[in-house]
């Protein structure tokens, strides 16, 4: 299985066993990965469409196979019980979505506090059907002065595609519309409607 190149500056997990596990999982699920991960120490990955819990499994398989050390934001209720330490080890950060106040600032401070960080976010903010992507991920990227890498989960082709790297401009709504257009033809696991 050919995997994309990953730049030397990108945060890595550094485990051959985890890398082998991720590659085996991708092969077992018959998924492939296209595109390249830029050689940057800090960026946001916008992953869409997010329509199923299987998206997490596919995303983790890619993260492990490429030896990426990612941070991701998850619903705080997922971080309870026996899975909490595992999710944190994987890079999970719990958030209370009912209180979005301060989330952008907290994420920006997270970027400022470290030398390397890749933050993966589902722009929809949920698995439910939404009319528009939320704009928080663009605000985070602008506040942290980092680009956004687009990554699609194409279930029709069983392919994760790393797409363009976007430097967000000052018109956040225009950026969100441009990013939505990139994902508009990608079919998630569950149809949106």
Regions found by a protein language model. Give the residues of each.
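Soluble catalytic domains of membrane acyltransferases
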Residues: 6-11, 27-185, 190-193
